[in-house]
Amino acid sequence: MRHSLTFFLFLTFFGTLIANVSEDVYVTGSVIKKTSLLVANPISTFDLNDIEKRGTLHIDNFLSNLPQINPSNSNFHSNKATGTSSVSLRGLGGTRTLILMNGKRLSPGTPMNGTAEQDLSQIPFSLIKQVDVLTGGKSTIYGSDAIGGVINFQLNRKFSGIDLSYQHSFYNHQNEDPNYERKNYDLAPNSVSDGHANTLQFSLGYEIFQDVYLTSYFNYRSVDEVTWSQRDISVCALSGNAECRASSTSPEGKFVENKVGGKTFHVKDNTFASGSTFYNFASKNHLLRPDKKNDVGILLTFENLEKHTFNVDYFKSSHKTVGQLDYSGVFRLSVDLPCNNPFLSNQQFTAICSDNGLTLSDTAPLYISRRNIEGNPRQQNFKHSTDRFVFDVDGEITNEWFYNLSFQSSRTTADFTYLNDISKQRAINALKVSGTPSKPSCVSGNDCKPWNIFLNSDGNLKSSAGLGVTKEALDYISTNLKVNAELTEDQYRFVTSKSFTTKNAVIPSLDMALGLEYRELNLKKNADDFSDGAGQQYPHSSLYGSLKVKELFSEIYLPLVTDTNLNFSIRYSDYSLEENSLTYDIGLVQLFEEKYTLKFSQQKAIRMPDINDLYSPTKVNQAFLNSDPCSGSNPSKSISECARTGVTESLYGNISNTETQINSLIGGNLNLRPETAITNSLSFLYSDEIDLEIDFYSISLKDKIGSSEVSFILDNCLETGASYYCNLIERNPTTGTFYEGS
């Protein structure tokens, strides 16, 4: 459960935050015609001019400057990049923020992870007419995912003329912070100008016949990379005291004996020295991902056709981006190294073999970590393409009953390639070598090439294996991993509404809307065996699944003569997984003269588990554990408490704790229930020469979908001994650690 209470203050000039709509229209957050001022949720409105003043080429960068929005995925993400751009309303996450375009749900973002998080890169920047940011639950109007709120991009359907624009931008940074200069690592350049971006936008619109409007557009954008090495704040990964964090997976390697109290070595010249060295793993990472994006689209509008309006739209968006990480390597790879490996010097043989009573015919069990600086940095290449078709018709049935019927279909594909990783199995094969330094051969035979990591490396490839790492060995152990995925969504929606007049003096009129909706998602994802990739922190796996929902909803609007306006809405959802939900929305808007408005609302909203939450297979995933209370020579927990987590008497007091990155298992669950959130909002608006909005809100989130923190599981097992937690814990049976082995 999550509870939060937050206070926001919005203060801007010239009415940019509060929409001044002079006519009744369909507004964000309602299916009944009224002004946005009468929507009980807090709502802020911006136009294209507001966005362009920021000078940004990314709509997510503009939105992230708003106080009610946090960034989710963006071009500034590399390590956990999805290749998409998204934002989070009220800090609840991108999967709990619903994105609309022209009042309709935007296509799902990426089939790579099968989540509902939508990609803002699909929005045609040049045609944005208005952006509405509505906070608070809106599942009654839009369905699942609208827990934090909705962001609606309204496009200019009646653009007239030709518009051609070009924009160039870049970053300039002075790396002169003295706090970083005192630290012991290489500094970034004194002054840099980078991240050059270019955008070309072309729009064409005209009235081809009377009341028939055609609008089309083409947008292109390219952005250059910025690496961490170009900034003083990121030239290495900084810890809390501004010192450089580092990885023990270094070019000198880390060789740990697989036994209780096993020694640790690294390569020094052609010998093993005690301990390990450290490597700056951050400098090659992307601080800003490079990308290329192009969009095309056509919007066709037919008006006044027997009291009907038809809209037919087609959108296509193509996006390429690369997320770069530092060199791969082998990370705590379990290897039974032959003691007769010809690359071992006499001193190295003595250290790991003869000192442990092993002979040339034996193997030394080791955990080996070693950075592959002879190769290239890891790169995650994303190629996304989205095709979206929308058909929409508005009209009058009879007796002032109005209706809206819409259908939309989208197809999003992803081609993903993970470059320059190392195959675990081939690395093991290449380390199991016999023969002589001049004529080494792999024990496994086949096309295996010996990998000599027992000499200091300068990063250059060698002509023969006896001198170090060769191109043949690098080619053999290197691997590229691929994913091809497709996510489709079809949605049908029908809404009918009518305004009733009454003879009641208090309630002179009543507006009512009824709606039906059907939505279906299908995911197909084919992935290589990512579990063999040594550098995979969040490995992909094949995934197939579908999700369907049938929904019925209603909204009632009561304008009272006392300038009090009441809103009620409700939605019933029936999901294909034998789950159903009922959501509601109650709102009150009180007007005081022309300057003051008071709003109150309470909503129950949901987020249904998405395809990834439901169907994802169980797989090894990277997790973080700051400390193990059962490690070290003097553990902070007793032996009886540690025994609950798998610590034996022989391991107690002999478990090392040198790593914070550990392995965990994570997967989907078909028994998941929908998340439910109760949101209460109170807003005060003042509008005169300036516009001022003050919002108070509280959110209670139950049945949150996600994985538990490993520290939470470990602490609860230690404290309670409950099998629910303790059965989730597995230590290395030999060393007792969480990070050695798989």
Feature names for model-found ranges:
Residues 91, 155, 206-207, 300-304, ...:
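Residue-level signature of outer-membrane beta-barrel architecture
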Residues 24-54, 110:
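N-terminal periplasmic "start-of-domain" segments of outer-membrane beta-barrel proteins
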Residues 137, 168-172, 220-224, 316-320, ...:
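Transmembrane beta-strands of outer-membrane beta-barrel pores
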Residues 162-164, 210, 214-216, 308-312, ...:
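Transmembrane beta-strands of outer-membrane beta-barrel proteins
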Residues 608-693, 742:
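Outer-membrane beta-barrel signature, preferentially recognizing the C-terminal barrel domain
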Residues 61, 65-67, 71, 75-79, ...:
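Surface-exposed beta-strand-turn/loop segments characteristic
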Residues 158-161, 208-211, 305-309, 396-403, ...:
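Short loop/turn motifs that connect adjacent beta-strands in outer-membrane beta-barrel proteins
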Residues 85, 149, 160, 198-202, ...:
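Hydrophobic, lipid-facing positions within transmembrane beta-strands of outer-membrane proteins
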